[in-house]
Amino acid sequence: VDFCVIDPDTGFEQRYRLLGPDQGIWHGHIEGFSLGTHYGFRAQGPWDPDAGLFFNENKLLVDPYGRGLAGAVDIRPEVYAHQVDEDLYPVSYPLEPSTTDSAPFNAHSVVIDTSFRITPQPKVPLDETVIYELHVKGFTQNMSEVPPNLRGTYAGLAHPASVRYLKELGVTSVELLPIHAKSDEPFLVERGLTNYWGYSTLSFFSPEPSYASAAARARGPQAVIDEFRGMVSILHEAGIEVILDVVYNHTCESGDTGPTLSLRGLDSPLYYRRTDTYPSQIIDTTGCGNTLNTDNPQVISLILDSLRYWVASMGIDGFRFDLAATIGRFSTGFTPLHPLLIAMGADPLLRETKLIAEPWDVGLGGW
């Protein structure tokens, strides 16, 4: 595995080979990188799509734990690990590895400062909670009191007019439709459409940059994160909790022949649930092309670490879990005693938050 540092202005890339794997971990200590550094990973390994293996060092991969994100994914042939035509369909079977570099067309992970003091959480009792579900981009679009340059942004949601409106309604908690950094699905791109709702996660740690104000986006990922944290603090000051609608059941990498942006290129069989008989085939209990493999302890850790980060560093007060039945599944089916669900309830940080489940998925017994 290579740790790749990228100059965002020139595209020049410096690669550092990591050591390992030691007990499954690739590691290294690299000094001299400042806040704002752009980076990603490249992973080498066997090319064997029939076994679910899509290692291709030509593909720059987003850090699954990256806190900041610069740019957006450009869905085009270069971001596929296998060769595809202009319509993004495989040019051959068996799949052949792509030889083009994806770095100019994938988002970049960015080093950011995580130290930020957020106003303490309101801790509204459950029996007094009034939740208002909203989309950050849509909520303020028609609010004349919010400046046009702030409408549809984190800063717009924190504007006094927005806060006053929520307080007048008696709202105690806002539930934000997905704000994790996202990418559009290929079938939408083919039709000239975008994923407005955001149930297509690219990064479980980074807020979606397009929901920040133009001024924040121009200053970079740190400013985007600071705007989000500032929004949370202002809402907390008004006594309003912030709950996130989160999508830990699948990612934006789609199905068996989707793009390779992050997890697929790092270890697809580990991160995505597959069949034992046909490991080339991803099991889909989400209706979105793939399913995160919560059989695996590393996937459980990824989800728990993400949840803790949003509470401890971003001030979040609770979560609504999209297709929650999926994250409580083993390969044999759903169980309320799944280790991930038990860990959420036992975690000293998470158990103090509001945890809301969408209690179904499209898998066997998911209704």
Stretch-by-stretch model annotation:
Residues 131, 243, 320, 356:
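Generic enzyme active-site microenvironment
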Residues 135-315, 323-349:
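Substrate-binding/active-site clefts of carbohydrate-active enzymes
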